[in-house]
Amino acid sequence: MDTRGSFSCGFLLLLLIQLQPSRANPIYNLSPAKELASMEALLERLEDKFALIEALESNPDLQEPQTQEEIPPELTDDSDEQKAEPKLASNTPLSYRNPFLKRLRGVQMPRMMRDSGCFGRRIDRIGSLSGMGCNGSRKN
């Protein structure tokens, strides 16, 4: 093909691409009826939530949490895992150096980041995500 023919084919292809409706954006795919129905459903859910909030505000008896004695025993879960966890008193202030919080932070941090001392946390995190770095080959 010559230059003029390739230019005209390219131009026609570009024109066809521009004229097709965009399928990547979901807004173009929604019809007004479907959009209206979804907005009405959202409005109904919001009205239900506001009615529930107003009912809770008008009846203070519904807001009070039940104590352990008021909860029926069939609704409570007496598993061994809950018994093994230490119970904290509600009036106990939690400090940064509390051993319970230290254990929770230790569980939260991945083992690689806890035991790492190679380059620092940021580099170790990048190394663990990419498989490169000093901790990339070690398996936990």
UniProtKB/Swiss-Prot annotation:
Q: Which SMART domains match?
A: NAT_PEP
> Which cysteines are disulphide-bonded?
118-134
Which GO biological process annotations does it have? blood vessel diameter maintenance; cGMP biosynthetic process; cGMP-mediated signaling; embryo development ending in birth or egg hatching; negative regulation of systemic arterial blood pressure; neuropeptide signaling pathway; receptor guanylyl cyclase signaling pathway
What Gene Ontology cellular component terms go with this record? Answer: cytoplasm; extracellular space
Q: Which domain of life is it from?
A: Eukaryota
- Biased amino acid composition, Acidic residues: 71-80
Keyword tags: Disulfide bond, Hormone, Secreted, Signal, Vasoactive
**Region labeled Disordered — which residues?**
55-94
Q: Which InterPro entries match?
A: Natr_peptide, Natr_peptide_CS, Natriuretic_peptide, Natriuretic_peptide_brain
What does the record list as coiled-coil region(s)? Answer: none
Q: Pro-region residues?
A: 25-111
Subcellular location, record wording:
Secreted
Main subcellular location of this protein, as a coarse class: secreted
Please list which residues make up the signal peptide. 1-24
Q: Name one GO molecular function term.
A: hormone receptor binding
- The positions annotated as site (Cleavage) read 111-112
Q: How is it modified after translation?
A: Cleaved by CORIN upon secretion to produce the functional hormone.
Function of the molecule: Hormone playing a key role in cardiovascular homeostasis through regulation of natriuresis, diuresis, and vasodilation. Specifically binds and stimulates the cGMP production of the NPR1 receptor. Binds the clearance receptor NPR3.
Q: Which family does it belong to?
A: Belongs to the natriuretic peptide family.
Protein name (Swiss-Prot/TrEMBL): Natriuretic peptides A
Its source organism is: Gallus gallus
Which lineage ranks, top first, belong to the organism behind this chain?
Eukaryota, Metazoa, Chordata, Craniata, Vertebrata
Gene symbol here is NPPA
